[in-house]
Amino acid sequence: MEEKNIHMQPNINYSYRNPNMYNMNYHNPIVPPPQQQMQLFVNDWKSILSPMQTCKIKQQFDDREFVADYFMGFKLDFNNKYLILDASTELMKFTACEKSEFCYRNCLPKICIPMNMKILSYGKEISKPDILMEKDCTCTFLCFNRPTIKMYDFSNNNNKELIGTIKTPYRCCSYNFNLFDPSNNKIMYMDDTCCQMSILCPCPWGPFKYSNFFLRDANSKEKIAHLRKEVPFLKFVKRDIDNYTLDFEQVQNPEWKMMLLAFALFLDYMYYDRK
């Protein structure tokens, strides 16, 4: 019998341990107390992310870099922090906190630096993140030894469960990212030109303000998600600060929505967070 290779699709909600959260037709014969239901809903990052159609990613301003740059003349780079908001309500849902060594950040090229980033739902402790993103230290040159981001679900008693990986093949005049599931099947990709006006000459007005990147399904090649980069007015004060709007469009699976969030953070880290 011929064995079928089934790939996880980003526009499908798959069954989880609590199927009643994602399937309105499912009836659970055992109903927990209301307190337990509320706690389960609040603490589960999938149930928070699942109904979101569009989110905003805002990089927080670090006044230490501003003081070091404009008053001391030093180009210092500190760990980034991002706020992730539901675009429809402007309410903060997640925060993303980067952790990398100070010497690595200020002495090595960004593409080579080992990186650790935690994504946690609003109100959670930094020691108990929902998602963990990891990038190893690599000696990267052009197409050799390209970096890979691994994303883990860390919400199950701090046990790491691989959700997917993000790889960035070398391209001369374009941004290329490939998103893979835990079985290393390519699910989505982005391949867009870097010759956009807002990239070549970033300014907070007119056609110089926005850059557009589109995620495509690996099989159909159709556009399934849209990432828009915005240049804020703080660009004049801190040159590497940017904001993003991520429209999930056809992506319904909360795990792949989180993968798209990780992709947006990785894109900013790799190409726009400059020393």
Curated annotation (Swiss-Prot):
Q: Which InterPro entries match?
A: Scramblase
What processes in GO biological process is this protein linked to? adhesion of symbiont to host cell; plasma membrane phospholipid scrambling
List cellular component terms (GO).
plasma membrane
Give the catalysed reaction(s), semicolon-separated: a 1,2-diacyl-sn-glycero-3-phosphoethanolamine(in) = a 1,2-diacyl-sn-glycero-3-phosphoethanolamine(out)
Which species is listed as the source? Plasmodium falciparum (isolate 3D7)
GO molecular function terms listed in the Swiss-Prot or TrEMBL record: calcium ion binding; magnesium ion binding; phospholipid scramblase activity
What does the UniProt entry report for the null mutant?
Answer: No defect in asexual blood stage growth.
Q: Is Metal-binding a UniProt keyword of this protein?
A: yes
Protein's cellular compartments: Membrane; Cell membrane
User: Taxonomically, what lineage is the organism?
Assistant: Eukaryota, Sar, Alveolata, Apicomplexa, Aconoidasida
Keyword Iron (UniProt): no
| Cofactor dependency | Ca(2+); Mg(2+)
| Protein name (database record) | Phospholipid scramblase
Q: Tell me how this protein assembles.
A: Forms homooligomers in the presence of calcium.
